[in-house]
């Protein structure tokens, strides 16, 4: 068994080895390549099928295999691969051969196949077959381009070591596959030859020449395929002929450009002390040095001719123009090797105008040391690797053998340990020095600063100091080359400068061509930092052998005699590198001056190669034309556009002096852009297009190309997406709640109609655009269309219409009517054919648009002539005026190509009013009149006949009745016995007769009446209905009477004498009948209503059984509510009497809710159904948490004994929240681990107010301290304000909606998410005054009212507040977009501008208005934070008309991120204001930001302010004039004047006075102000609001464009009055948009709503800091460290400069003041922050325990941390005791900090900065503390 398993294991391992071996992989790959069938197989199969002899077959196969072998060799041999992979290979070799072969084969008599000896190998045809197969195999990328196979090769080559074996095996694999394929083809051909069924086919047998025809057909097919291949390759190759040669930047231009740039740099970097001469020396020839600025590119660097010092320049490549044509290589003759061959975009830098050369890949693989191991970095700087290769070739430094990985790793560990020891020792020494009593200033580690001037000891500005500013780490300015020296310079002083030439010159090799392939010129200075850290210890590479490097002076370098040759030891490689790169030496004092002057700091950036072209686009070209520069055509493609001249000013102004271009007329032109999808924008002209596969465009205007694979991911149009759930909900709602059915249907109908209309309009517009674009794209279409339009216009005006007028008037004369020549000709003259541009801008009747044949034209017909059969006389009354006006509005049209009229260009043709329609109408009228007369006569006659007939019938009836009477009298004489039965019978008969007569009479009369009425003009249907109703009632009455009479007659048998009595049997039968009838009726009714019965029954069962379960907790809830209601009411009543603060009109929200609720519940007869099932516990406690701090002991019993409703956890939760006291008040540790407890203690994370304010969903203190709760009545959406359990109003028959809509669900989830967020962040939001974080600006120590109890929504996570952001963002998680009065909005529409001219903006932002109302707490006013600018305006809920203040107070909009990313050099004077707004954009009051602020001089008098004033601020009642300047001053007085400034009013006042001293502006009168406003407004607007985009609303834009179109026409007319009036009547020209007032101010424009200032669009992107602080916000629950509600301020006892302001903040920590045990100095602050971090990281690395080879080196052993965790476990609530806490903090200081957990900067550990993705390899720390 053991043996078997052993053998089996061996077999498996053997199999795995074989499968993974290079040979097998190669064979597999080779076999796959067989299926890459291309055009090369055409010739091979042709040779086989045509049967031209074995020699040809053999030569074809040999050529084919040789070609494939070449391809496989090219995989291994790089030069061959490069040669074949170039696009020019196809151009130079492939295409000419293809074309030659194609034309040769197509010409039959060009070569004769059979002329030479077949057996000769020299036969040209056999050689050609070989060549065909060989070359075509090389070009085999056709049917399957086999990109997958190429990738496979790359992967396999990367993996396997033995590359030769891989290539051979893959070739063998291909050969096997190829042989199999050819055998398969041979079998198929053999089968065709031998198949009897094919041969027995009569068609084949009868055709003798079938074989020869087949051969001809095959050769023809091969030629067709060959042609297709040629065409295909033509698309792929770069064309050598048709490329657009681009103009290179001339030397002079470049020189000028460089001069400009150097001037900029002088301004930026040089100090004021430097003289002009030194500047010249420092910055003159930057281009000449190798490692120059960003703008340096290979072509400029090596392509520019250097004058006078070519012999010194090692990389010199002469410019092409300096060589003769025969000296240039062939390829550069054919192709411009510096141009764009792929569709590259032109990336332009603002400072350096030439385009970036982006051929280079962003990935560059190279090995680099990472964590002591050599790893492959794929973002390694290529320049660095090239540089290392150069150094290796030139120096003996790196020639020794390299160290093993273990040695390297150990060395790395050793250096880290050494660093740690050094840091530890230094740290301990500093602490010991402190203990000995040294001054702290001497002990603290000082930051190294760069001096600007040693004598004056001025440091560099912080921005440019590399030691202070990370991103701005410095590079030292260039060393200077010979170009600085004049030829005549001989003095030694000048010659000393020559030392500073680029010392790297000498070590670079002279044979530059070796590096040409991967040349990427590097910038020595910028790379110095990279080299310093990448070559961490050059000794690792160089070994320990000492290196003797001699620096030879060449080419006229002068060195002072006293300076000796330098030696470099391997122990100090960095010194060597520094000497290489930096122009710094310490030997001679003479050099120091040069060195200090040449220091300049630059931001590190990626140095990119640039093209030598300076390209322009269309717009820049036009700008240059305006500047009268002669330039070539623009080289960058813009969007397809056409320039349309709309106005040419030919008037010469006599006052203006005659200039050179005075003859040229001034043109006003618009640019018309094509509406097609534009994928060529910003491409360089002549560049090849990318061959897109699997991409389609299916819309008229499509911004991006889409792949059909991802169609399901795209938001589809209406037709593809249909909201099924919405329709189902709609149906169910209508089914269950019938009452609201009609209302909803009406509103829905309206909405659907509007939507339909919009859709139709959109559809029509798209169709029009499509037609316009088709005309635009077809060649010569515009010319054809233009000519046709002009022809149609002439035909219409001068042929068709005059002939119609003549014909009409002739017919009138024939019909003996007056002709209307004058009227018709007047109307015909009025018709104007105005020539318009393609977009419809009107020009004039005679003037054609410029280039109208190419650009297109429209012809607009004003007052289009309409032929009428007659004209109305003017004397007729105008009773149809309104209709006429309606028709007159669209009194113009556009002419179509077919001579029709259309409303809009390219729209559908409109129906013209018919000529014959009024004639026919008139005829109809006359016929109707004649009919009326005729029918009137007829009806009179009929009436007369009817009357006569009536009389006759009456007379006959009377005679008949009289005769019957006589007969009756005779019958009475006879005896009863004899004639009894007969009498009854006769009477019955008579009755019958009489009935029939009566009924006939009744029936006949109405029919006659109806018939007679038919002829009149009454409404026939109404009459018929009436008559039918009368008829039915009369018939019913008759029938009833007859049945009664019959009953009385028939029920008179002998046994019952009296006719009025009935027998018992009859009664019984009658009652049975009656019951039967009732039951029948009832059953029918029951069958009809069965459906509803079942439904009601099921509903009853549902309500009785299922809702019973829901009602059980409701009882408890009711009891709970009643008890809380009593307690709360009592408490509030008491509280109101104690305190004045709470407003009587608005009691607490929860209480008002509960009052409403119980008042409704108590009303038994109320039909409202209260669905308390939606009242969740979470919601209830949310509401409770918003109440004022209630009397907790009263609630205690309720909250303890309602066990069904309240659980222990919730009771504890409420206890911790401070709503009531639990017996054992626990601290809420539910959401936190022990590490968070620890984290709480670190003052570094007691974040600044700004940071916290981003997390906290505050209602910015507007109303809390005024103790008001405003009911939000207007807020109609589903927010927290809408109390769920009130708004459930249902009818009796309705049930709980079984299909809640998606929206409701969404909102429900949203609300609970919000609640859970608040639960986690409750310390931030709602905690009581003792335990919770409170901003120092808003602490109420005495009263325990949480400052934001009136918080309907949290705005810090899901709802983006501020400017109603729904306009700018996707509607993702933003539901509550209705404007709540609690929200602050930035309303840009109604803002005014600050019009002060000369105000210091710092002072403007520095105005501190932190005056709180109603509190006695100290307010911090920090000089360094000028941003706590808050205004206090009460929003009066009883005055909804107060528009300005009613829009949410409007004073603090909430935004969560900076508005834009402007660089500081944009407007320098705007920087402080913008920065302030960027940091805290929601705090600056808008009124202060944008309105005129007149400094209030009286504020200094308000020093003794009564603190007991009411907290409500009055609003100026005159709301209409709130934008007027005078009222603003008054309002601001009120805002400043009222309120309690607390006990430190005077201190605060000083701050305020100080700030106001700067911006103290006296009041001006309105007149003076309005004068100065005009200039100041514009200036102010330009300076401050360019970061906002201006836009007007779309309707206004459209109206403006319409006006412009009319102006264009009016300008050209001699007498424009008539057209102007008519265009105003038509509504084409709008007067409200015209600028009639010339002095209309910006303020007015904004007030009118014409101009809207919008912020630049925001993106939904949380920045990293925000997320980080969110995380901290969750963990830091106890933030009472921030509460500074003592009446004192702790002194800052440490200098801020050395402690980064961190201890200053810490100094405010709440400590027991009785003991002077303030927070001790945290020892880590001795070190600088950078060294601090380094020490912490070194300590936590524990690098000794790592494995070197196999493991991923990112994890480490965390044993050394356990002792801290044990310490933590002892006391979970360590922060409750301050002294303990301080000790705890001191104990833990250096080890574990949040930034160490997340972002270890690998900068100190010699990691190459290029490997950006090493962030993925962050050290994953194990959990510090044993959680759980």
Swiss-Prot record:
Disulfide bonds: none annotated. GO terms for biological process: protein transport. It is a multi-pass membrane protein. The keyword NADP does not apply. Residues 270-279, 1550-1562 have a biased composition (Basic and acidic residues). It comes from the Eukaryota. It is found in: Plastid, Chloroplast inner membrane. InterPro entries: TIC214. Residues 270-301, 618-637, 741-763, 1533-1571 are annotated as: Disordered. The chain crosses the membrane at residues 18-38, 64-84, 87-107, 124-144, 172-192, 222-242. One of its GO terms (cellular component) is chloroplast inner membrane. Keywords: Chloroplast, Membrane, Plastid, Plastid inner membrane, Protein transport, Transmembrane, Transmembrane helix, Transport. Pfam families: Ycf1 (PF05758). Its main location: plastid. Part of the Tic complex. Belongs to the TIC214 family. Involved in protein precursor import into chloroplasts. May be part of an intermediate translocation complex acting as a protein-conducting channel at the inner envelope. This is Protein TIC 214. The gene is TIC214.
């Amino acid at each position: 068994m053991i043996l078997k398993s052993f053998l089996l294991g061996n077999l498996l391992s053997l199999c795995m080895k074989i499968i993974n071996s290079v040979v097998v992989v190669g064979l597999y790959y080779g076999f796959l390549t067989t299926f890459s069938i291309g055009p090369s197989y055409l010739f091979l199969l042709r040779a086989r099928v045509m049967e031209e002899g074995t020699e040809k077959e053999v030569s074809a196969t040999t050529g084919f295999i040789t070609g494939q072998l070449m391809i496989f060799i090219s995989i291994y041999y790089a030069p061959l691969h490069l040669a074949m992979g170039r696009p020019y290979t196809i151009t130079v070799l492939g295409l000419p051969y293809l074309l030659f072969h194609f034309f040769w084969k197509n010409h039959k008599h060009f070569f004769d196949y059979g002329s030479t000896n077949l057996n000769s190998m020299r036969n040209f045809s056999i050689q050609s077959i070989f060549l065909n197969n060989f070359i075509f195999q090389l070009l085999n990328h056709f049917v399957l381009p086999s990109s997958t196979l190429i990738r496979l090769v790359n992967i396999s080559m990367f993996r396997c070591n033995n590359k030769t074996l891989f290539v051979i095996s893959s070739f063998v694999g291909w050969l096997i596959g190829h042989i199999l394929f050819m055998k398969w083809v041979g079998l198929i051909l053999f089968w065709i030859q031998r198949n009897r069924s094919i041969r027995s086919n009569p068609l084949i047998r009868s055709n003798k020449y079938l074989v020869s025809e087949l051969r001809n057909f095959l050769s023809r097919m091969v030629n067709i395929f060959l042609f297709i291949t040629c065409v295909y390759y033509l698309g792929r190759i770069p064309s050598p002929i048709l490329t657009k040669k681009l103009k290179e930047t001339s030397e002079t231009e470049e020189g000028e450009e460089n001069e400009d740039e150097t001037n900029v740099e002088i301004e930026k970097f040089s100090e004021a002390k430097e003289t002009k001469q030194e500047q010249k020396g420092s910055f003159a020839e930057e281009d000449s040095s190798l490692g120059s600025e960003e703008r340096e590119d290979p072509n400029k660097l090596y392509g520019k001719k250097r004058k006078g010092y070519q012999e010194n320049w090692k990389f010199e490549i002469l410019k092409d123009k300096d060589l003769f044509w025969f000296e240039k290589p062939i390829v550069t003759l054919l192709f411009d090797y510096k141009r764009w061959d792929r569709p590259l975009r032109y990336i332009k830098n603002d400072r350096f105008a030439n385009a970036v050369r982006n051929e280079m890949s962003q990935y560059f693989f190279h090995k680099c040391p990472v964590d002591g191991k050599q790893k492959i970095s794929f973002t390694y700087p290529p320049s660095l690797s090239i540089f290392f290769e150069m150094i290796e070739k030139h120096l003996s430094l790196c020639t020794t053998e390299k160290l093993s990985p273990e040695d390297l790793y150990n060395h790395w560990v050793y250096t880290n340990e050494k660093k740690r020891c050094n840091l530890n020792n230094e740290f301990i020494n500093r602490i010991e020095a402190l203990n000995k009593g040294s001054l702290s200033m001497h002990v603290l580690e000082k930051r190294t600063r760069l001096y600007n001037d040693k004598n004056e000891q001025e440091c560099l500005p912080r921005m440019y100091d590399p030691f202070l500013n990370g991103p701005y780490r410095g590079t030292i300015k260039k060393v200077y080359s010979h170009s600085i020296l004049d030829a005549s310079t001989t003095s030694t002083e000048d010659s000393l400068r020559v030392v500073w030439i680029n010392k790297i010159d000498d070590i670079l090799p002279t044979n530059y061509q070796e590096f040409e392939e991967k040349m990427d010129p590097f910038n020595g200075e910028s790379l110095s930092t990279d080299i310093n850290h990448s070559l961490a210890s050059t000794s690792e590479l160089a070994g320990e052998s000492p290196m003797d490097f001699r620096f030879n002076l060449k080419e006229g370098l002068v060195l002072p005699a006293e300076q000796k040759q330098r030696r470099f030891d391997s122990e100090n490689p960095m010194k060597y590198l520094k000497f290489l790169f930096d122009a710094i030496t310490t030997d001679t004092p003479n050099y120091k001056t040069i060195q200090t002057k040449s220091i300049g700091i630059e931001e590190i950036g990626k140095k990119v190669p640039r093209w030598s072209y300076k390209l322009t686009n269309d717009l820049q070209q036009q700008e240059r034309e305006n500047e009268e520069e002669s330039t070539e055509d623009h080289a960058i493609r813009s969007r397809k556009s056409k320039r349309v001249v709309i106005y040419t000013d030919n008037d010469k102004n006599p006052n203006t002096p005659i200039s050179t271009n005075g003859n040229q007329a001034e043109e006003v032109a618009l640019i018309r852009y094509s509406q097609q999808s534009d994928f060529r924008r910003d491409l360089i002209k002549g560049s090849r297009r990318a061959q897109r596969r699997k991409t389609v465009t299916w819309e008229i205007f499509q911004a991006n190309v889409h792949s059909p694979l991802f169609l399901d991911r795209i938001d589809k149009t209406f037709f593809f997406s249909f909201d099924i759930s919405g329709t189902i909900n709609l149906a169910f709602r209508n089914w269950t709640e019938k009452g609201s059915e009609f209302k909803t249907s009406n509103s829905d109908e309206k909405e659907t109609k509007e939507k339909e209309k919009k859709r139709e309009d959109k559809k029509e517009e798209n169709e029009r655009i499509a037609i316009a674009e088709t005309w635009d794209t077809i060649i010569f279409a515009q010319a054809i269309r233009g000519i046709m339009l002009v022809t149609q216009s002439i035909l219409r005006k001068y042929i068709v219409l005059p002939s119609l007028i003549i014909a009409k008037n002739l017919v009138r004369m024939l019909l003996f009517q007056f002709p209307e020549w004058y009227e018709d000709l007047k109307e015909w003259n009025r018709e104007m054919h105005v020539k318009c541009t393609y977009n419809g801008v009107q020009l004039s009747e005679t003037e054609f648009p410029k280039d109208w044949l190419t650009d297109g034209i429209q012809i607009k017909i004003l007052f289009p002539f309409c032929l009428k059969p007659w004209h109305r006389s003017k004397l007729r009354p105008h009773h149809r005026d309104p209709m006429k006006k309606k028709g007159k509005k669209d009194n113009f049209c556009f002419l179509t190509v077919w001579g029709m009229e259309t409303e809009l260009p390219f729209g559908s043709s409109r129906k013209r009013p018919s000529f014959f329609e009024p004639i026919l109408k008139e005829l109809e009228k006359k016929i109707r009149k004649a009919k009326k007369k005729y029918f009137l006569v007829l009806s009179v006659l009929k009436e007369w006949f009817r009357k006569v007939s009536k009389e006759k019938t009456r007379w006959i009836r009377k005679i008949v009745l009289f005769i019957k009477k006589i007969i009756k009298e005779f019958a009475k004489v006879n005896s009863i016995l004899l004639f009894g039965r007969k009498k009854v019978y006769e009477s019955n008969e008579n009755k019958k007769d009489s009935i029939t007569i009566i009924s006939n009479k009744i029936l006949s009369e109405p029919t006659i009446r109806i018939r007679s009425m038919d002829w009149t003009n009454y409404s026939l249907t109404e009459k018929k209905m009436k008559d039918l109703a009368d008829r039915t009632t009369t018939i019913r009455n008759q029938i009833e009477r007859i049945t009664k009479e019959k009953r009385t007659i028939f029920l008179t048998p002998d046994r019952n004498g009296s006719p009025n009595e009935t027998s018992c049997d009859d009664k019984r039968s009658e009652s049975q009948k009656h019951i039967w009838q009732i039951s029948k009726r009832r059953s029918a009714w029951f069958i009809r209503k069965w459906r509803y019965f079942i439904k009601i029954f099921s509903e009853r069962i549902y309500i009785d059984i299922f809702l019973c379960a829901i009602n059980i907790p409701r009882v408890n809830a009711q009891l709970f509510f009643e008890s809380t209601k009593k307690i709360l009411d009592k408490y509030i009543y008491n509280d109101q009497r104690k305190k004045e603060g709470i407003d009587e009109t608005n009691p607490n929200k929860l209480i008002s809710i509960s009052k409403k609720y119980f008042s409704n519940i108590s009303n038994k007869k109320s039909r409202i159904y209260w669905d308390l099932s939606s009242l969740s516990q979470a919601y209830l406690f949310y509401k409770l948490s918003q109440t004022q701090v209630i009397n907790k002991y009263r609630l205690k019993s309720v909250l303890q004994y309602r066990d069904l409703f309240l659980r222990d956890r919730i009771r504890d939760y409420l206890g911790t929240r401070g709503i009531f006291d639990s017996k054992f008040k626990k601290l809420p540790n539910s959401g936190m681990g022990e590490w968070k407890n620890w984290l709480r203690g670190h003052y570094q994370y007691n974040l600044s107010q700004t940071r916290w304010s981003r997390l906290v969903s505050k209602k910015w203190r507007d109303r809390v301290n005024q103790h008001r709760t405003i009911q939000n009545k207007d807020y109609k959406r589903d927010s927290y304000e809408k109390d769920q359990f009130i708004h459930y109003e249902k009818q009796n028959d309705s049930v709980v909606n079984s299909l809640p809509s998606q929206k409701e669900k969404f909102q429900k989830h949203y609300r609970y998410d919000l609640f859970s967020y608040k639960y986690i962040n409750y310390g931030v939001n709602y905690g009581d005054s003792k335990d919770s974080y409170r901003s120092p600006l808003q602490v109420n120590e005495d009263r325990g009212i949480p400052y934001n109890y009136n918080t309907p929504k949290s705005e810090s996570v899901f709802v983006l507040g501020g400017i109603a952001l729904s306009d700018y963002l996707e509607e993702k998680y933003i539901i509550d977009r209705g404007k709540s009065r609690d929200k602050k909005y930035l309303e840009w529409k109604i803002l005014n501008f600050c019009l002060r001219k000369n105000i210091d903006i710092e002072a403007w932002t520095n105005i501190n208005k932190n005056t709180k109302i109603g509190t006695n707490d100290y307010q911090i006013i920090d000089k360094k934070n000028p941003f706590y600018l808050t205004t206090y305006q009460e929003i009066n809920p009883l005055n909804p008309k107060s528009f300005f203040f009613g829009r949410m107070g409007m004073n603090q909009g909430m935004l969560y991120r900076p508005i834009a990313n402007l660089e500081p050099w944009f407007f320098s004077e705007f920087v402080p204001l913008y920065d302030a707004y960027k940091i805290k954009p929601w705090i600056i009051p808008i009124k202060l930001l944008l309105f005129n602020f007149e400094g209030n001089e009286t504020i200094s008098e308000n020093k003794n302010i009564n603190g007991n004033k009411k907290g409500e601020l009055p609003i100026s009642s005159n709301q209409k004039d709130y934008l007027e300047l005078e009222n603003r001053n008054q309002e601001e007085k009120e805002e400043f004047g009222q309120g309690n400034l607390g006990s430190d009013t005077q201190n605060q006042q000083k701050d305020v006075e100080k700030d106001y001293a700067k911006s103290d502006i006296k009041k001006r009168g309105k007149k003076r102000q309005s004068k100065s406003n005009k200039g100041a407004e514009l200036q102010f607007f330009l300076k401050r609001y360019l970061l906002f985009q201006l836009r007007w609303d779309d309707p206004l834009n459209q109206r403006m464009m319409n006006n412009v179109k009319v102006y264009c026409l009016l300008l050209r007319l001699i007498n424009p009055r008539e057209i102007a009036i008519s265009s105003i009547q038509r509504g084409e020209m709008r007067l409200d948009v015209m600028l009639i007032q010339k002095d209309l101010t910006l303020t007015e424009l904004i007030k009118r709503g014409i101009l809207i200032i919008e912020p630049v669009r925001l993106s939904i992107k949380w920045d990293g800091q925000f997320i980080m602080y969110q995380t901290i916000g969750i963990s830091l629950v106890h933030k009472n460290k921030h509460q500074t509600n003592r009446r004192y301020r702790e002194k800052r006892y440490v200098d801020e400069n050395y402690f980064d302001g961190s201890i200053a903040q810490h100094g405010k920590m709440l400590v027991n003041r009785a003991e002077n045990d303030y927070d001790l100095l945290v020892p880590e602050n001795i070190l600088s922050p950078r060294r601090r971090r380094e020490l912490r990281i070194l300590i936590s690395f524990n690098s000794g325990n790592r494995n070197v080879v196999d493991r991923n080196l990112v994890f480490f052993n965390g044993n050394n941390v356990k002792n801290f965790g044990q310490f933590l476990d002892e006391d979970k609530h360590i922060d409750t005791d301050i002294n303990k806490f301080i000790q705890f903090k001191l104990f833990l200081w250096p080890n574990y900090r949040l930034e160490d957990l997340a972002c270890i900067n690998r900068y100190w550990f010699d990691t190459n900065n290029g490997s950006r993705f090493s962030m993925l390899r962050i050290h994953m720390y194990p959990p510090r503390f044993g959680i759980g």
